[in-house]
């Protein structure tokens, strides 16, 4: 009698993982008591802040299990701006990619770096960290992911490496937050500190994080280059847009014109983000314009441009749905009025910790809070009015409490399925979340350990 072979464990689809998290959140509405903080609008900044010591219980309003599908719909609707932006990015980049200009450029670059291919990793990380620590760019840099992937594949690396050197560069820069108005700027304002003060220590943190992240990605890339089967995405069929069997060594005049349009477009994008306060609406308009112009330059008719755009948008629809479904967790916790209770409970953990480890505890608790309040600005508005009094009582500087917030908010965004920026990167790159997590978890643990050391260092130097 033949024995049946054991079925190999397969990681569930990202939809399944998110639905499990949603069910846990729904169950929590029956267990966690409802409560809320009193909020007020700060006249000086116009921001809605939490009043310290104002938490109070209110009547429970647990979620009816039959309304979970409706909550998913609400999560998708509330993510509409992000989803629309991603669909437009997917469509526009498909038009641009189909011209062959991007492939030709990356092939030229790969030849330039062929003898020093691993140098590309720290160079890209550093470049995109600048976008992160100056303009607070995170989800916005997903537009550069196809370039990183194409270059990485030409260098004999994998899509994960190409995605990581773009996404993690922005993540490191955003977290270090030298001049980031969305985490450090908001938190320091609430903590009544001089804007962007404490710069020197944040520069040190940036350098250490860039070095650690570069070393980790290079080690992974070397392993994949030597043994392709060790790639975390080995065995997954390659996407058609990242196959280069017909790539040539020459760049046509039309392709050069497309690259010029792209360069001008990215220049306008950076100007708009830094000087005009652009967001998804303006960026979407720019990329529609770029895609159409590049299509016409390449000799495409309107119908060909439309077909390519549709194919590109279709290719990332699953990733777009993931972003909306992930938003459902926040919708459930907020509607049931248990979000503030969870934050209140986590902050109280810091209060009962020994003074010697309170700084590290503040960082770890901010990381936990980021699981339910993924928005950096939103997290600052809720937690900083609570953490500042705690730090004042135990003799920890307000600058250190801001540091705890920025590290706690920044690191976990690269692993949480609720992070719209992470899901955006993965949607564009078509890397399954489970595979990314396998690659990212060791680095996340390294970041967390470094975060604890940064907090201890802040205490030692009197930051």
Task: Write out the residue ranges for each language-model feature.
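Core transmembrane alpha-helical segments of multi-pass membrane transporters/permeases
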Residues: 14-23, 48-103, 278-341
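Hydrophobic core segments of alpha-helical transmembrane domains in multi-pass membrane transport
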Residues: 15-31, 86-94, 127-131, 173, ...
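Alpha-helical transmembrane segments and their helix-start/interface "positive-inside/aromatic belt" motifs
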Residues: 6-22, 153-165, 255-258, 310-319, ...
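Hydrophobic alpha-helical transmembrane segments of multi-pass integral membrane proteins
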Residues: 87, 116-147, 323-328, 333, ...
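Membrane-interface alpha-helices at helix entry/exit sites of multi-pass transporters
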Residues: 107, 116-123, 157-165, 196-200, ...
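Alpha-helical transmembrane segments and, especially, the helix-loop junctions at the ends
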Residues: 91-92, 129-145, 153-202, 213-218, ...
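Long, contiguous bundles of hydrophobic transmembrane helices that form the permeation core
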Residues: 1-17, 40-47, 199-308, 428, ...
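Membrane-interfacial loop-to-helix junctions in multi-pass transporters
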Residues: 77-83, 110-123, 155-161, 256, ...
């Amino acid at each position: 009698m033949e024995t049946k072979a054991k079925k190999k464990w397969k990681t569930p689809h990202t939809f399944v993982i998110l639905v499990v998290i949603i069910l846990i959140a729904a169950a929590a509405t029956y267990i966690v008591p409802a409560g809320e903080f009193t909020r007020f609008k700060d006249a000086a900044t116009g921001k809605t802040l939490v009043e310290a010591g104002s938490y109070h219980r209110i009547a429970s309003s647990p979620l009816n299990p039959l309304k979970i599908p409706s909550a998913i719909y609400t999560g998708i609707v509330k993510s509409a701006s992000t989803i629309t932006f991603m669909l437009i990015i997917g469509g526009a980049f498909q038009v641009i990619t189909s011209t062959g200009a991007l492939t030709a450029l990356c092939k030229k670059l790969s030849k330039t770096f062929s003898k020093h291919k691993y140098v590309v990793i720290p160079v890209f990380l550093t470049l995109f960290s600048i976008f992160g620590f100056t303009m607070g760019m995170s989800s916005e840099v997903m537009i550069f992911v196809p370039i990183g992937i194409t270059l990485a594949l030409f260098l004999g690396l994998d899509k994960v490496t190409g995605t990581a050197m773009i996404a993690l560069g922005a993540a490191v820069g955003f977290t270090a937050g030298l001049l980031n108005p969305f985490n450090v700027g908001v938190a320091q304002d609430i903590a009544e500190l001089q804007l962007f003060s404490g710069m020197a220590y944040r520069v040190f943190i940036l350098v250490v994080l860039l070095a650690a992240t570069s070393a980790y990605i290079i080690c992974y890339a070397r392993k994949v280059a030597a043994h392709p089967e060790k790639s975390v995405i080995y065995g997954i069929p390659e996407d058609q847009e990242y196959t280069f069997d017909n790539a040539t060594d020459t760049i046509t005049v039309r392709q050069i014109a497309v690259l010029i349009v792209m360069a001008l477009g990215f220049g306008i994008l950076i100007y708009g983000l830094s000087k005009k306060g652009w967001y998804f609406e303006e960026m979407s308009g720019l990329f529609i314009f770029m895609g159409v112009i590049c299509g016409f330059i390449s000799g495409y008719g309107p119908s060909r441009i439309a077909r390519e755009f549709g194919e590109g948008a279709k290719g990332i629809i699953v990733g777009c749905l993931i972003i909306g479904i992930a938003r459902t967790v926040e919708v459930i916790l907020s509607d049931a009025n248990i979000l503030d209770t969870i934050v209140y409970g986590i902050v109280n953990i810091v209060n009962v910790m020994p003074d010697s480890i309170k700084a590290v505890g503040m960082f770890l608790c901010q990381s936990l809070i980021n699981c339910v309040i993924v928005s950096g600005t939103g997290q600052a508005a809720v937690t900083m009015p609570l953490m500042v009094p705690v730090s004042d009582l135990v003799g920890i500087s307000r600058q250190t409490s801001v540091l705890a917030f920025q590290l706690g908010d920044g690191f976990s965004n690269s692993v949480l399925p609720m992070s719209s920026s992470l899901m955006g990167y993965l949607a564009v790159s078509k890397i399954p979340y489970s595979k990314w997590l396998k690659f990212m978890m060791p680095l996340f643990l390294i970041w967390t350990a470094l975060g604890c050391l940064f907090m201890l260092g802040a205490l030692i130097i009197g930051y």
